[in-house]
Amino acid sequence: LATLLTPNIPEAEILAGMKIQNKEDIQNAALAISKLGSKYVLIKGGHFQGAEKIDYLFEDGKPITSYRGLSVNTRNTHGTGCTLSSAITSYLAREMDMNTAIAMAKTYLSGAILAGKDVQIGNGPVNHFYEPKALFIK
């Protein structure tokens, strides 16, 4: 099926059939979601309140891995979930391990969010082309 699922908190709540309010809930939800057939579950913590946003990677039988990121005060967040999963996929295609792929994808996404432009109505898009040369790996 899929190697990695990347639900945000509301999506994870639906997939797991439970409310998520803390890290223990995230672990229980990730375990339930992994039973759908995915080796890895990355629950994105962007919907939690606070200055720091933490994503949690679950792999059955291993300790949960946390990926920290700053909360950016912007409305230009349209496409962040798709951008993150696509970036992870691109790094995996370059034969990086899952942890490295996620860390690099989060770095890329942070830059794309910071470079996003206002469109005056609703949530604007992230800027996928903010600094592509810096991301090239030789």
Task: Label the model's feature ranges.
Residues 1-64:
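Conserved phosphate/ATP/ADP-binding segment of small-molecule kinases
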Residues 20, 67, 126:
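Short clusters of hydrophobic/aromatic residues that line enzyme substrate/ligand-binding pockets
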Residues 64-78:
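Short pre-catalytic strand/loop immediately N-terminal to key active-site residues, enriched for Gly-Thr
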Residues 99-138:
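Charged C-terminal helix
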